[in-house]
Amino acid sequence: MATISVAAADRRVSALILLVGFVVFLNYVDRGAIAIAAPLLKNELHLSATRFGLAVSAFFWVYAPIQYIVGWLCDRFCVYRALAVGLAIWALSTFLTGFIGGLASLVILRVFLGLGESVTFPAGSKIIARHVPTEQRGYANSLMAAGIALGPALGTLAGGTITAFFGWRPMFWIFGLATLFWLVPWLLTARELPAFGSRNSEPRVAAGKLLRQPAMWAMGIGHFTTTYGHYFILTWLPLFLVQSHGFTISQMTLFATIAYLAQGAAAFFFGWLSDRWVRSGRSEAAVRRGMIAGSLAAMGLAILLLAFATSPAAILSLLVFYGVGAAPCSINLYAIAQMFAGPRAAGSWIGVQNATGNLSGIIGPIITGMIIDATHSYWSAFILTAAVCGAGALWFAFGVPKIEQVALD
């Protein structure tokens, strides 16, 4: 990841922003590990599609609702330490997943994984809003967006390779231990900042005032549509390729990796492009609204066409199209939220928005699993997901109110 210039040209802050991008990468490596293991794990633990969907959704039972509180904590206490504690919890949960013996232990560890990972986006957005000027936030947020894509890309490549040669349990052990090493550069970098270890001295925003903002709930609804599509691909793509199209684990790994690499590369491009347009004098609100609406439309179209694809070439082309189309989504999703909230309320705002948006992670996997078990096909699940993405495109185009910093005093 390239170094981003920041307001004070401070190397420590530049390193901090890079580490925020990298922690999102680790977040998605560990979150997506269950999908890589799924073809073998489901058989070994004798899980139906519905029970597997239940295990996947368990991550969100805590991940989504706890963010209402986590965002508030990031605005009031040391956000740098909060992120470190969250990572330690999820890394240990990932490691211990390699020892599970059934559905119950899998569900429990998925819950703790969700608890640890819940800190990532409220903390990351708080740090970006605090340290990065508005005309550079497209690129700063592209680091997080690239992590969302490159985590599954390299995680699928590494995890698929480990699983193919050694089984799915060693994959969880290796991923969990590797994630813990992030704490070393993070603590060495963050502890040099004046704000490290102290309570936040910024003026507080009353929770009631924040919760009465229609724009925040509108963003939460839009966020729901983005995550519904993203988690559908992240969770079910490996099973879809293996079960519906007869791919081997190695073939599935290759196709998924190429798609996610395309998404990661496109994230850097769209982050740079959005900042360039803003610096050239275009309305930042119009740029970011247009990009996210177009992104959701592209995601929906790609998912719809995947339901009808039959040849490996067509599937790969559509997966790459999905990846490139999805890239602007996360960049602008968080950049718009940072515009609405401003630096002092960014943690709380993202916490509420992320919590609302990630409710899709609770219901989506269960709905998808039930559809697959009932129809013995992925077709209807793909159609439903495409429709949700299409609705999201319309919502961001016409449903989200005027994008500007709201009055919170």
Mark where each language-model region is.
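Extracytoplasmic gate region of multi-pass secondary transporters
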Residues: 34-35, 214-270, 330, 334
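Helix-breaking motifs and short loop linkers at transmembrane-helix boundaries and internal kinks
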Residues: 46, 78, 99-105, 133, ...
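Juxtamembrane intracellular "pre-TM" segments in multi-pass secondary transporters
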Residues: 2-10, 193-220
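Extracytoplasmic
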Residues: 15-49, 233-238
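Cytoplasmic helix-loop-helix junction between adjacent transmembrane helices
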Residues: 109-149
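Conserved MFS/SLC helix-loop-helix module at the cytosolic interface between two early adjacent transmembrane helices
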Residues: 65-104
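Helix-loop-helix hairpin linking two adjacent transmembrane segments in secondary transporters
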Residues: 144-188
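C-terminal ends and interior cores of transmembrane alpha-helices
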Residues: 88-101, 294-310
